[in-house]
Amino acid sequence: MIPAIKINDIHKYFGGLHALKGIDLTIEQGEFFALLGPNGAGKSTLISILAGLIKPSAGNVSVMGFDVVNQYQQARQLLGIVPQELVFDPFFNVREMLRFQAGYFGRGPENDDWVDEILEGLGLADKAHTNMRKLSGGMKRRALIAQALAHKPPVIVLDEPTAGVDVELRQMLWEFIKKLNRDGHTIILTTHYLEEAETLCSRVGMMKQGEIVALDSTANLLNKFAAKKLCLTLGEVALPAKIKGMLRSQEKGVFTFALTDMAQIELVLSALRTANIKVIDMQLNEADLEDVFLSLVGQQ
């Protein structure tokens, strides 16, 4: 089967800045894939190349087998991209905007049933005849997602789709996107809400300084890189030097330690007993994708 996305040895220079350093990535049809990384890692540059907005300095990218540079129209026809920015045409209502967007890709009145499904799925049905300028910020975000889906592309890129939106919209959006994925659409997600990626995505790629530093299933990443977390309520105390290196975070007298093996629990408790520090409460938690992220790319 032809991959949904094939990225082969992509480099991108902006003057003297080497923004992408030999990215190799294959995303299969039907995947729900997360692309994660701190600001400046190169995610937006990679998405811009995928969308045909900028050209790579070296390497090639294809969408469903079509090269994004040499076969731009065919590749773009198969791709829907939800941008971070709220960019919209202020002169049309929501339905008009979606019909125009679909028309750019050769879709006519036969596409109206799909437009209705999008409007219903994203909670925009009662706003179909409302001018885009009059929508709230959250509704504009929904409309932008609908716009990316208007021509029914098989591959959908969601670039921070839930940034700055309320919980209700986030849940509605993910229910609709999960349905699209079940129906066969390939979903690529970038997000700073790591719990979303952990819950939704079957595979994760993590970027740092223009390179992919981890690429695996979510479960494998958790098993390989994440440590357990020991949370101790100690009050306002000074930790013994012996265990300071294991400290992940400290807030209001609660100290969180990263453990690479269970034997370290006794190491921590022994050091506290020796220092006459009383443990008020103790919890042992499983690691999550945020722990993997911090371990691999740092707290940037």
Identify the residue ranges that each predicted region occupies.
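Conserved ABC ATPase "signature" region
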Residues: 99, 103-127
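Catalytic Walker B motif of ABC-type/P-loop ATPase nucleotide-binding domains
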Residues: 156-160
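ABC transporter nucleotide-binding domain
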Residues: 174-259
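Short, charged/small-residue-rich alpha-helical element at the C-terminal edge
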Residues: 227-300
